[in-house]
Amino acid sequence: MSTKEKLISHVMKEEPVGSRNKVTVVGVGMVGMASAISILIKDLGDELAMVDVMEDKLKGEVMDLQHGSLFLKTKIVGDKDYSVTANSKVVVVTAGARQQEGESRLNLVQRNVNIFKFIIPNIVKYSPNCILMVVSNPVDILTYVAWKLSGFPRHRVLGSGTNLDSARFRHLIGEKLHLHPSSCHAWIVGEHGDSSVPVWSGVNVAGVSLQNLNPQMGTEGDGENWKAIHKEVVDGAYEVIKLKGYTSWAIGMSVADLVESIIKNMHKVHPVSTLVQGMHGVKDEVFLSVPCVLGNSGLTDVIHMTLKAEEEKQVQKSAETLWGVQKELTL
């Protein structure tokens, strides 16, 4: 008799139940690992699967996390074979090529499309009913690519979009007003990154519209220069990259925030990337961030945001830029 047999007596033969709240993270780079640790610490899944083509890095990261299993409630698994991801509820894609110096955005996009052509069919094969969350950049275009390659209905494919941009925005407004970001309600919509659109008309604290108090808010003529806050949101990522080489923690927390709303069926509203064709005057098949309701079925509803004509025009301009890139892609 083995030590185990002397210690434990079976009452019944256990049938594998399978995981109900399994989350997969594809890519164990800085963003993938920050997402993984955020998901683990928030206790969101009963199993976390990690997958990457770089076998040694993957093995090392998984072992490192597993060594902390005593302090967690989530089973951690990892393999370069996608079978490890089977039956996931949510799959978070953070993998992708890094932009090289002097590389055009279109070239980077096409390289990432080629990577997605391998990743997405593997996800679909093992988790045909999952909710697919794209984090890799440029996130709006790659969410469109993932949607096309997966064949999933649009409510099961979303991009992390401007969830982080809006968090940065609320943090900076909070700093200026000496308030906690959760008390500063503000939204950034449109494209994640340089051409994102701050909805100044919607910025409020306790229901008090800041634009009612300062009608010039967000414009060139504003003596308080609130416009600089949006510039800081856009430049924030570049600043962090310049200082530490990459961004990771805030995007990781942002991903966990979205995963939580899905797994816990919270029906919480987040600015995430979804198909916006037919909204705000957008004619093409593009994905941009608008306020969306997230729950157990995925992205169930879109909130009709009241945008000013100028804001709407910016969204349309973003859409045209994205479509210009998308129509050149070979899927």
Swiss-Prot record:
Its EC number is 1.1.1.27. Belongs to the LDH/MDH superfamily. LDH family. It catalyses: (S)-lactate + NAD(+) = pyruvate + NADH + H(+). The keyword Cytoplasm applies. NAD(+) binds at residues 29-57, 98, 137. The gene is ldha. It comes from the Eukaryota. This is L-lactate dehydrogenase A chain.
